[in-house]
Amino acid sequence: MKAHEETNMLESMVVLIDTREQPTERAKKRYEALEAPYERRTLSYGDYSYNAQLPNGKWLFEDGETVSGYAVVERKMHLDELASCLTHSRDRFEREFQRAKDHGARIFLLVENATWENLLAGRYRSQFNEKAFFASLCAWLVRYDLQLVFCKEETSGKIIKELLYRDLKERITRGEFDEGR
């Protein structure tokens, strides 16, 4: 891919937001913080992914198509929600991560308002024992090759966009989309 084609592809990037993400006031602030075009689409897994226009004019994912992204961000509001996903909703959560892994997607698990220190100290609302929570999360990081990101909710939009942009840039650099010329 030529340099100008790479630039055009990166500039065409649109952040995809899963239709199941509720458009709350907090979410709207996150969308604004993306500082990038975005659209709501049905994602096979994850809460955020991306689309981009190939040099031949086609998009990675066509309108109406359920998106199985190359990279996804699974966002959780806090440790409480993550604890619930690893206990009460574990089967559903596991199926979603397995689908992403089977598809070869890069998975970022982003947890707002969280730190390792808060997890290890049990500073969250759940009966999930902190040692079990820690062990379970570490096992998931290894099992699904997850990249874990803790951040404040104010910065999550910016981080989501940058992670997706960098994944797209890396794939372009490696030539993964060269056949779409």
Regions found by a protein language model. Give the residues of each.
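Non-catalytic C-terminal interaction segments of nucleic acid-processing enzymes
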Residues: 1-68, 80-181
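Conserved catalytic cores of phosphodiester-cleaving nucleases, focusing on short active-site segments
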Residues: 71-77
